[in-house]
Amino acid sequence: MNSDSSSVSSRASSPDMDEMYLRDHHHRHHHHQESRLNSVSSTQGDMMQKMPGESLSRAGAKAAGESSKYKIKKQLSEQDLQQLRLKINGRERKRMHDLNLAMDGLREVMPYAHGPSVRKLSKIATLLLARNYILMLTSSLEEMKRLVGEIYGGHHSAFHCGTVGHSAGHPAHAANSVHPVHPILGGALSSGNASSPLSAASLPAIGTIRPPHSLLKAPSTPPALQLGSGFQHWAGLPCPCTICQMPPPPHLSALSTANMARLSAESKDLLK
């Protein structure tokens, strides 16, 4: 009985022992943490004390300088922004003024009606009109080049000096020919017929000139001033062919200078 009671009493007293042990252990752990924190803080304090006074003053001055610099920079930036806005506005105003002047100059040369009642074209309409006008001029220039190439190029024989007929025929046959004659040589030929027995048979290169090209317009002179059917080409364009550029035959040297002067005087009288 005594042994049982002692065991029960020992069991009942064991929880108190455990609580005391845990409390003591917790107190020791807490004290250890506090001592560690105190040592860290004391170490930091010692380091701060060991830092030289110059570095501390330098850091404070740097912070103060940065704050003051930021304030000055902010004030200057507002002034700079105002100046920048003024510069941008002036540059944009000048650009628009130059653009309007250029558009006005382009409208002056555009082929459309000018006047107070005509509405002014917009910039886009002016540019489109200028584009179409340039394309039209380019196509006209290309067509003119093509026509000139046909006149002086491969189709040169269609309206100029053709094959020379060397067959000797009657002078009346050459006179009744449908081919026109060069005006100067024709006048010389007529004057030669009046003064000397010079006929078209002796000048085979004169009676074989073909009629003018159909693309060439007829001269706008009145009928009284018409100088012949062959003059409508020779008055406009010089003949570049070899037959017209070559010197005259030896038998044409019989024409004197007086006859040529008389021919030129007659042509001037006709043109008056």
Swiss-Prot record:
Signal peptide: none annotated. Keywords: Coiled coil, DNA-binding, Nucleus, Transcription, Transcription regulation. The keyword Coiled coil applies. Pfam families: HLH (PF00010). One of its GO terms (biological process) is spinal cord motor neuron cell fate specification. GO terms for cellular component: chromatin; nucleus. One of its GO terms (molecular function) is E-box binding. Residues 1-71 are annotated as: Disordered. Residues 83-137 form the bHLH domain. Residues 36-46 have a biased composition (Polar residues). Residues 24-33 have a biased composition (Basic residues). Residues 1-14 have a biased composition (Low complexity). The keyword RNA-binding does not apply. It is found in: Nucleus. May determine the distinct specification program of class A neurons in the dorsal part of the spinal cord and suppress specification of class B neurons. This is Oligodendrocyte transcription factor 3. It comes from Homo sapiens. The gene is OLIG3.
